[in-house]
Structures are given as C-alpha cells and as structure tokens.
C-alpha cells in the first residue's frame, strides 16, 4: 500500500475526529476526494482505531516524553471542542522554523496528588526509542525543501478554513450570547484567559490562540504550564466522553441499518396482505358449491357407513327417522346435530404448536383467548386507531414489562377513540339501543348530565394520566358499582334473549322481535310494524306493500317465536321466555295455528318479562313506576361504589399502579376497554365484509319446520361464538353465536390505507388481521400481520382457532402447512375458499418458515439462557418474570411457535432502549405540555430536568450526577476539582447499552419536576408569606429527596396547604367548580402516580390564564439563593 501524503493524512485525521465509524458510502466519497481507494480508506480507519486515541496512544509511540510541546500541540489539534481552536493551531504550525524549547514538567508531588491516573503508564519507566525510519516533525530538523513544498498548500487551506470559521462564528454569535458556549470551548477559553470574561468568546479565542507565541511572555511560566496541563486533562476527558457517544451512535446506526435491511426483504411486495377485490370474487365463485359436511356425510353414506341419529333406536318401532334419512342433512348445522359421530378435523397428521411457551400463556388457555381477542381488534382497526405497527411477540412481551411504552401508547389511542365516540353519541341527543352495549349505554348516561367531565377527560389525557382516566371511565361504565351491575343486567335481558334464539340487532327479524316483545300479549299489526322507525332504518323497500309482505313472511316463517292472534296481528310466544328450554311444552301438530292462545303455555317468573294486564290504565301506572325506578337507579349509579369495587383489576388500578397488575389483570383491562369501543359509532359503522361461505347459515324454517329447529336447539348446542367477533366478555357468558354473524378482518381497510400511503411510506401495509377461511368443522384460520419484515411471527405463522372450545394453535412449518392442504377438500364451500387463500400464500409462507428455522438453529443457545441473578441494572423497570417461571418454561419454550429470548444480551439491550424511549415519552407528553413549562417565568437554570442515564433530577446549572456519575457541564470556578474527580471517581464508560447503576422511576421524577414547575410559575401573592421566606427552600430539598408515592404526596400536600385560595378564585376563568374540586379532592384522591398527575394537570389548567399573561422575571433572587446555598454545602 502506497504511502499517504501529509495532506491526505491530515484530512483523514480530521474526518476521523468527526466520525470514528463512517459508513461505506462516506468512506467512498472521502476516498474520491483524496484520490484514495475504498480499500485504502477502510484500512486506514481500522489501523487508526486500533492505535487508540489521546495521551495513551502518544505515550506508547514515544512522542510525549521526547517533546512535551508536541504533546500539547497534538492534543489541541485532536480536540473537537471548537473549529476556532483547530484553525489557531494550524496557523501556529506554518510560522517560520523555531527552535524547540522543552517545557518544565509539573513537580512529582502535584502529579501524584492530582493528575495520577490508575490506567496511566508506570512511573519511572522509559519509553521506547523511535524506529529508524520514523518521520520527524518539521521543526525537529526536516529539510527546508519539504517545508517550502507544504507551505503553499497549508496557507491555502488555512485561508479557506479562516473564511468558513469567521462565517460560522458570526452566525453562532446570537446563540452563544443567549445560551452560552459549549463546555469544552468554555473551559479552555476561561483557563487560557482568566481575566477576559466579557468579550466575544468565538472571535477572541481565535485571536488569542493565533497570537499565543507572541503573548506567552506576559504570563508567568509556571502558571502557563499549569493551565496547559489542566486544559489537556479536561480535553482528554471530553474526548473520551465524545468518543463513547460516537460509539453509541454508531451502534445505533448499525442497528437502524440492519432494521432497514430486514424491512427491504418484504419492502417490494407482501403477498400475505388482505385484498378486498379478491375476497369478493372468491365469495361469488364458491357460493354455488355444496356444504362441506353435507359432502362428507354423503360420502360416508355411499361407503355404507351412514350417520344415524344418536337418539334413534331400532327398537322404538319407527321404520325411519327423517333426520337419519337425510332430511336434516340438507342443513349446514349437521355437525351440531351429530357432534360425537364426526371424526376430528384437522387430523393429527397436521402438527400444530401452542402459540407461546412462557408463563402464563402455556398454562392458561383462557388468557390466550383474551390475548387473541385483543390482538384481532388492534390489528383489524389499526388504521382507525392510528397506532404504529408492532409484532405479536412484542405485544405479548409487553405484558411482562413493568413499564411498557407499547401498552401505554395503545391505551392512549383507545381512550382517545372512546372519548370521541362518547362525544358523538351525546351530540346526537338520543341513544339508539340498536347496537349499543349495556356498559356503553351506562357510560353515556353517566356523562350525559356532566359535560364538564368529558371535556376534562379529553383535555387531560396524556402519557401519565391515562391510567387514572381509564379507571374513572370504567367506573362510570358500571364496572365498579354493584347497582350499576344490576342495571346492566336489567338492560341486557333483552339482548340475552335475542342471542339465545340466534337473533341479531340490525336485522328485520331481530327488530320485529324487539318491538313485539315490548308490546307484550297485545302485539302489533303488520301495518304498525311497517311504519315503525326501527324498520324504516333497515331500508327494506320503498313501497309499503312490499315492506308489509316482507314482514309477514318473516313472522310466519318461525312459529316458535311468533304467533298470529288475529288476521294481521302478531305477538311473541310466551313459552319462548322460559329460562330452561327443555321445560317448555312441545308443540302438538296443530300448535302452529294462528288461533292458539298462550294460556296453555308454561311461563317463567316475572324476572324475565313482566306480563302486563290487558287493562290500559293499570298498564300506564306500571310503566310510570318502572320509569321512575330506572331514573332513580341511574342517579345512584352515577356515584362510585367503592365498597363493591367489582373486578380485581379495577381495585388494582385504584390502590396501585398499572405496572403492578398481573398479566391476566392487564388482559381484563384491555378486554373491558375493547368491549366499550366495539359499541362506539366509529367501530360499529365500519363497512365490514361478510364471509358468507364461512358462516353457519340461518335455518329458514317454514311451517312445521319450525318444530325441527326448536327441538334440535333443545337437544344440541349451537357452535360457540368466536372471541374475535361478537359478544361481551362480562355479563354474557356461554352465549351461542348468531347464525348470521361473520368473521371480521381487515379487508375493509385496504382502500383506506391506500389513501394514507403517502404518510406511511415506511411500511408496505398497516397491521392486518387476514381471515383465510374455515374448514368443515368451522375451525377458523388467521394471519396477523404486524411490521412487514422477517422478524414478524405473523408473516410466517398460520393461526388456528378451534370452534369447539376456542383454543388457539399455530402452524409454523411448511410440513404442517402442506399436510393441512392435503386433507382439505376443494369441493366444499368453506374449504374451497380456505384452499384458495392458502395456495395463494403458500410459497411466501414456506419461504418465511424455512428462513426462520435456519435462524433459530443458529441462535438456539439464546433460549437456554437463564438469568444468573434476580438483580439487574434496570431492576426497577424490569419485567415481572421470576427464575422459577423461566426455568419451568424451558421445556415448553422449545415446543412453542413464538420463542422469547429471555436473559440474552440482545434482550437486555432492547429492554434498556425501551426504557429510554418510555422515559422520553413520559416527559414529552406530560411535562413539556404543561402551561407552567411552556410559559416559564423563571430563569432557565432555575428548573429541574432529568439525567437520561439514571433518570435522576438535577438543576440546570449542576455539573455532575451523583448516582451514575454522568457529567452535564464543566463548572467555571471548579475546573481543578473536576479534573481530580474525573481521574479518581468517574468510572470509565463502556459502549454497552445498559448501565450498572440504579434506574429511578420515570413517573416519579416527572411528577417532581412538574410540581416544581407549577410552584415556580405561581406569583408570590398566590402563596402565603411564610412559604416564600423560609418554607420554600426546605420544601425544594424534600421534593428532590422523595422516592415514593407516599412521600411525594406529603410534599405536594404541604404545597397545597400554602396556596392562597382567594388568588385562585380571581385567577381561574372556570369559576368555583374546578377550583373547589382541585382543593377539596386532593386528600381523597387515589395514591397513585397517575392520579397525582391528573391533579397537577387540573391545577396547571386552573392557573393557565395567569401564566400565559404574566411577563418573565428579569431577576431571580430565589435562583441565586438556591445556587449560593448549594455551592456552600458542596464546600
């Protein structure tokens, strides 16, 4: 490799100081500008990094002992604190040849006491001599010819640098005067110019450094040497710190590059995403095929093994059962009629795995069901919720984290949409009971009379208050009150009754049932039903005659629910209200007559339905009593009944933090919130496609066929409802699925995302739930597509939902996928669509499955790693996993489809980065949005901020963190003390991404900073006199020392006691309501960080009018007093 010229070396050195780990593109551009190849530049950077930096590398080369002046000059040249310093050194180098003068070193006692470093060279050792071919410095004897050749080039370069430097100094002058100069430049300039503190730092430093040789005789030699030695030590520490930061940035850049490369694998096209047009064409094509189980029974009958009814016996004397002869085989519900005679499907040859091998997922199928219900909702409505993409394993892992950024952002989006739905329903003025759940209706009734609460919820929602707002919203919906639960049960009776008979709101049959049920035994005429608003909304027909014909045919088609009591009047049969269907009397052959009376029918107690007398006056009296009883119940239910908190997770939110909840309790919170959102107008009015071929169709019974339907429903159970579409989790258990329900996926959002493609160019598609189809047993197959890259489990797994008990399994290898395709029959309606969906994605899935298997085999050792101890650098924000759970999950993790790297270095590094992002999110969405912070009246230095390494709070003018020993700024008056501390106390920072010190809670630290900001924003007349004179200083110290919720509550209580209420009366624009609530509710509010944050937001809103109008203060006596007292305590 050819020798590089001095100019090339100098340019490489300058680029190296700016960026130690350049990208290949940057190295290529640098090589082109210098006339070097990429290989030469890369090799030079490798050798330069291996040699090391700073004093240590110079000592090893033998230059520091030979010429101390060269040592000092090299340090100044390598410093990156200022461009002006580098220019001054360059100008000093081109001055004529001077005789080298040796510098007198500091005495040994000074070195041993203040400068000695443990990692420095051994005292008394001699340095190696320079090799014979080493290149010497120009002023130590280089030829005059070489000097003359370099002078012109150096002069030209220095002149260009001087022009750029002067322009930069002029542009940065205003910023420097406002915020001060950097810590490295400030320290060097003040050390070299102790008597000049009121001049322009940028220009004067350049002039002083350029004329340093001429003015060197003015200062005593010993003082000058001491200042240089001190400046070199300070610059050395700054170089070490900046090099560490550059390493971290380079590691982060490499991670981003790897992430981009991973995303490019699926960037061009994702064949797994849902396609709405293909979905419609497929439904039209397969609608003509025969039902899958009817096809299966025909084949069994042809093979001589026909299915027989389980209750049919040859000894009964009957020569043939119409069910066994195939009359009922024309129904697609044959699997429900003969559940014990049909073989298992899919067979055992299709090997499936459990989704997760981690506790509690591997031992609690119910938790897995709830998890996939939540996942399905989030993936399906990701565009509506406006949440960023995430993978299934990231979401599952977030439940184990103590403070999860992902769960916080998702809850924030869900709450924003829920409040928007509540506001939309309140603006309409009337609550339609068409598709609103009982809990959502209770929430609307609670907020209807208190509009200010809704405004407060919407304006106060942020990253720290969402937990308390979630608790208040769920309590208002009736989850925390016993009487609200009774009310919800009363409101849900009609819904339960409809679900028992397979009716659905929004359909003609369901609305007719609701209207006739409300009229009791009197019923309604067909003309009255046709003119009802509930029927008009369905848009059946424009002509009244056609509407009446549709209603008449619907009522006459099911004689088990409706009976005709006159020529054009229908009512609901009384025996359909029986609690136990088996106890109801069976119909005789003539029970379908329209003249049948209800006297012969057995009825249940009045809890199900109240039979109203035929006397109209008595009926009106009872209706008034019922309405009065309901109105009183609503008033009572608006209060929070803390004696009956209801669900355990609600009590946990009231008495503790969200992070203290268990995994199951966090899931219950999600499910409750999703049940409320499912009834909102945003989700309810989505135009969702219907998978007609995959749903059990309604049994349209005419005439005596109604008896078959009722008798079969009494003997056999309907298939269970899917967790991912329909039914409330709380209050409605074990309900049968509506016969005309349909699976919901993301097919409808494909067009909506195409409109937003310009704003979301980083992802090929949004998060999606893709419904692939169902098999002959109504088992469903799903894809959950998260972030479109190779690390997403949804892009390489097919998720199986059982129709028997609702458990979930995963197909994650191509052998199982092809085995499933081999057992499916494309002649059936449902399996034909499933085959088409799987074959379309087969090659893509198999390739992703195969590549993942190779990756797992290479990194299999990660799954066997267990934490060596329970403590970690992030123990306060670590996950909730314990050693026993991890050890017990070792075996199950190997057989699970999705494996978590518990205890690995990569997992710890990812956890630390998530903690830092969570901390930034808390401060950005809570602290920085406070009016007291945005309109700060006090000095910038008189405010609290946090250390990004350990989250500890410090004042703006502090220099050093006492917990993690991070350096914020170099103190002007204590440079020597800082140098001693840097050499003896400060630990050497490694390039690891997780520290070994204690990490403090981000919530508590942000609360303390917010309290101090609000207290500082209030004027002197807003607080009692004794507070400003003596109590404030002690209160600030107590605030910084507080480390728990109880301690910070006591500190805030002292502050509340010092507030002048009269000032708040005149300050607030919102009057007595908000002011009284803030002052009076503080002692009784829950002792949680979220509740305290909500109280602070209310107080900040109350004083916002004054803070926005008040001018900033010029003098800060409190700041000066605080700084003086703190520095005196340091000494």
Swiss-Prot record:
GO terms for biological process: flower development; regulation of transcription by RNA polymerase II. Residues 239-264, 579-609 are annotated as: Disordered. PROSITE patterns: DDT (PS50827), HOMEOBOX_2 (PS50071). Residues 365-424 form the DDT domain. Keywords: DNA-binding, Flowering, Homeobox, Nucleus, Transcription, Transcription regulation. Residues 252-264 have a biased composition (Basic and acidic residues). Residues 587-600 have a biased composition (Acidic residues). Pfam families: DDT, HARE-HTH, Homeodomain, WHIM1, WSD. Residues 2-56 bind DNA. GO terms for cellular component: nucleus; transcription regulator complex. Residues 239-251 have a biased composition (Basic residues). It is found in: Nucleus. GO terms for molecular function: DNA-binding transcription factor activity, RNA polymerase II-specific; RNA polymerase II cis-regulatory region sequence-specific DNA binding. The keyword Iron-sulfur does not apply. Transcriptional regulator required for the maintenance of the plant vegetative phase. May prevent the early activation of the vegetative-to-reproductive transition by regulating key genes that contribute to flower timing. PANTHER family: HOMEOBOX-DDT DOMAIN PROTEIN RLT2, HOMEOBOX-DDT DOMAIN PROTEIN RLT3 ISOFORM X1. This is Homeobox-DDT domain protein RLT3.
């Amino acid at each position: 490799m050819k020798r590089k010229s001095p100019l090339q070396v100098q340019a490489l050195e300058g680029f190296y100081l700016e960026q130690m780990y350049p990208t290949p593109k940057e190295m290529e551009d640098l090589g082109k500008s210098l006339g070097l190849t990429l290989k030469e530049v890369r090799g030079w950077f490798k050798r330069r990094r291996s040699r090391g930096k700073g004093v240590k590398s110079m000592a090893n080369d033998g230059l520091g002992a030979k010429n101390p002046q060269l040592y000092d000059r090299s340090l100044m040249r390598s410093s990156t604190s200022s461009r002006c310093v580098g220019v001054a050194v360059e100008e000093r180098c081109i001055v004529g040849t001077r005789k080298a003068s040796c510098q007198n070193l500091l005495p040994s006692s000074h070195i041993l006491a203040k400068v000695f470093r443990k990692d420095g060279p051994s005292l008394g050792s001699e340095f190696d001599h320079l090799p014979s071919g080493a290149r010497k410095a120009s002023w130590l004897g280089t030829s005059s010819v070489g000097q003359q050749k370099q002078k012109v080039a150096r002069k030209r370069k220095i002149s260009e640098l001087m022009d750029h430097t002067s322009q930069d100094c002029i542009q940065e002058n205003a910023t420097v005067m406002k915020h001060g100069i950097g810590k490295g430049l400030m320290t060097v300039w003040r050390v070299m110019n102790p008597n000049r503190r009121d001049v322009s730092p940028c220009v004067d430093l350049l002039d002083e450094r350029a004329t340093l040789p001429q003015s060197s005789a003015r200062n005593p030699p010993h003082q000058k040497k001491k200042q240089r030695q001190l400046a070199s030590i300070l610059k050395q520490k700054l170089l070490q710190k900046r090099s560490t930061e550059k390493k971290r940035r380079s590691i982060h850049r490499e991670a981003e590059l790897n992430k981009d490369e991973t995303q490019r694998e699926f960037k061009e096209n994702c064949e797994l995403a849902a396609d709405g047009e293909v979905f419609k064409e497929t439904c039209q094509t397969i609608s003509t095929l025969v039902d899958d189980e009817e096809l299966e029974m025909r084949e069994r009958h042809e093979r001589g093994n026909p299915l027989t009814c389980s209750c049919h016996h040859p000894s009964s004397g009957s020569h043939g059962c119409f069910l066994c002869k195939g009359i009922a085989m024309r129904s697609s519900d044959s699997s429900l009629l003969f559940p014990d005679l049909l073989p298992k499907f899919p067979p055992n040859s299709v090997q499936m795995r459990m989704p997760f091998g981690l506790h509690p997922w591997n031992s609690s199928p119910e938790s897995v069901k709830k998890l996939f219900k939540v996942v399905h909702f989030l993936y399906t409505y990701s565009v509506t919720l406006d949440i960023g993409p995430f993978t299934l394993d990231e979401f599952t892992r977030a439940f184990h984290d103590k403070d999860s950024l992902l769960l916080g952002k998702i809850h924030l989006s869900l709450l924003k949409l829920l409040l928007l739905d509540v506001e939309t329903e309140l603006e309409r003025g009337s609550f339609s009971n068409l598709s609103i759940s009982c809990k959502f209706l209770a929430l609307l009734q609670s907020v209807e009379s208190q509009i200010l609460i809704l405004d407060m919820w919407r304006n106060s929602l942020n990253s720290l208050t969402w937990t308390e707002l979630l608790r208040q919203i769920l309590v208002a919906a009736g989850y925390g009150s016993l009487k609200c639960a009774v009310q919800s049960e009363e409101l849900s009776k009609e819904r339960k009754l409809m679900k028992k008979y397979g009716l659905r709101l929004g359909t003609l049959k369901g609305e007719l049932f609701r209207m006739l049920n409300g009229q009791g035994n009197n019923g309604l005429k067909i003309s009255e039903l046709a003119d009802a608003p509930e029927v008009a909304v369905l848009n059946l027909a424009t002509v009244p005659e056609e509407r009446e014909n549709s209603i008449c045919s619907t009522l006459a088609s099911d004689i088990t629910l409706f009976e005709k009591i006159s020529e054009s009047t229908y009512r609901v049969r009384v025996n359909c209200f029986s609690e136990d269907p088996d106890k109801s009397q069976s119909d005789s052959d003539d029970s379908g007559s329209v003249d049948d009376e209800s006297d012969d029918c057995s009825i249940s107690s009045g809890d199900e339905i109240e039979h109203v007398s035929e006397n109209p006056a008595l009926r009106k009296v009872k209706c008034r009593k019922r309405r009065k009883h309901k109105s009183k119940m609503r008033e009572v239910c608006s209060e929070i009944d803390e004696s009956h908190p209801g669900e355990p997770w609600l009590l946990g939110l009231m008495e503790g933090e969200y992070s203290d909840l268990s995994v199951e309790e966090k899931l219950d919170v999600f499910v409750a919130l999703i049940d409320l959102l499912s009834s909102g107008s945003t989700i309810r009015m989505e135009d969702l496609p219907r998978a007609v071929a995959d749903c059990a169709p309604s049994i349209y019974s005419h005439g005596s066929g109604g008896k078959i339907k009722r008798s079969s429903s009494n003997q056999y159970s309907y298939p269970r409802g899917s967790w991912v579409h329909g039914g409330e989790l709380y209050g409605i258990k074990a309900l049968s699925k509506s016969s005309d329900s349909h699976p919901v996926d993301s097919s409808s959002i494909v067009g909506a995302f195409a409109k937003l493609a310009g704003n979301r160019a980083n992802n090929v598609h949004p998060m999606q739930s893709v419904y692939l189809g169902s098999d002959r047993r109504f088992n469903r197959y799903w894809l959950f597509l998260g972030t479109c890259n190779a690390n997403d489990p949804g892009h390489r797994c097919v998720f199986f939902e059982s129709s028997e008990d609702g458990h979930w399994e995963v197909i994650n290898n191509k052998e199982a996928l092809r085995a499933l395709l081999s057992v499916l029959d494309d002649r059936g309606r449902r399996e034909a669509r499933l085959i088409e969906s799987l074959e379309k994605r087969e090659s893509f899935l198999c390739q992703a499955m195969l590549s993942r298997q190779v990756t797992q085999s290479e990194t299999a050792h990660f799954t066997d790693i267990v934490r060596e101890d329970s403590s970690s650098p992030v123990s306060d924000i670590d996950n909730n996993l314990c050693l026993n759970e991890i050890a017990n999950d070792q075996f199950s993790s190997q057989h699970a489809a999705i494996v978590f790297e518990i205890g690995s270095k990569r997992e710890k590094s990812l956890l630390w980065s998530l903690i830092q992002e969570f901390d930034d999110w808390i401060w950005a969405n809570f602290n920085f949005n406070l009016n007291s912070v945005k309109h700060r009246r006090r000095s910038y230095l008189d405010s609290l901020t946090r250390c990004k390494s350990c989250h500890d709070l410090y004042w703006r003018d502090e220099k050093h963190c006492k917990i993690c020993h991070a350096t914020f700024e170099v103190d002007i008056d204590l440079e020597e003390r800082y140098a001693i501390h840097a050499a003896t106390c400060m630990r050497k920072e490694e390039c690891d991404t997780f520290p070994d010190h204690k990490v403090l809670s981000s919530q508590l630290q942000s609360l303390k900073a917010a309290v101090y900001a609000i207290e500082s924003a209030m004027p002197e007349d807003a607080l009692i006199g004794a507070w400003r004179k003596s109590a404030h200083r002690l209160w600030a110290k107590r605030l910084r020392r507080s480390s728990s919720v109880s301690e910070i509550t006591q500190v805030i209580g002292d502050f509340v006691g010092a507030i002048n209420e009269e000032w708040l009366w005149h300050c607030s624009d919102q009057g007595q309501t908000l002011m009284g609530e803030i002052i009076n509710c503080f002692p009784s509010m829950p002792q949680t960080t979220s509740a305290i944050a909500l109280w602070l937001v209310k107080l900040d809103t109350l004083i916002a009018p004054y803070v926005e109008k008040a001018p900033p203060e010029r003098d800060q006596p409190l700041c000066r007093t605080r700084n003086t007292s703190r520095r005196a305590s340091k000494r």
